[in-house]
Amino acid sequence: MTIDHDAVSKILKIGVPAGLQGMVFSLANVCIQSGINSFGAGGIAGSAVELNYEYFAYYLVNAFAQTVVTFTGQNYGAKDEERCKKIFRLGMLCSVISCGILSTIFVVFRTFFIGLFTSDPSVYHYAQLRFLIVLTFECLTSSYEISGGCLRGFGRSMTPAILTVFGSWVLRLIWLATVCNWFHDYELLMAIYPISWVLTGTMVLVAYFRTRKKLFL
């Protein structure tokens, strides 16, 4: 029994950039956390409360993103363009709808959900701001997660990783160093999430459609 070097190479080619993308998100969140810390105990606790619900919504998106990687890879291998297109459409639709519904429930009934963790007015204030600014737009993450998953299914894992590094790390660092440095405002700090999602999603979607067009010429 010997190592299949070709298979290992392909696994690393897809897996390493995907891992890098996850690491970049963690680094970006660490930087944002430093900004959150400047708002004291209320800001820190309020953000932590909302994150519990944000993760529920995001993991729905992530589940569909992982699914489209597998099915796109299978059908790309079979050179079935129509199925690849259908996988993208269904994955995006299911991701946006499921995340949108859950996020809406959390936001509409935020008083109840926040109340499960705290009754402190300061914590509630910051938690509801993050609910309204971040969780309301959580379904936007589908734009780069689903299209990025399809790109990985095509064997193009580096493209979404590089675009995500720029959209989710570089942009957020610039925002923290400029806007948040000029204006010490919690709402402006939280606004970087949907802004970066729109930018990253747009870039990865464009990359997906251009790549798909080239692959099935």
Task: Give, region by region, the residue ranges found by the protein language model.
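Hydrophobic faces of transmembrane alpha-helices in multi-pass small-molecule transporters and flippases
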Residues: 3-31, 36, 52, 56-60, ...
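C-terminal structured "cap/appendage" subdomains that terminate the fold
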Residues: 147-173, 177-184, 189-191
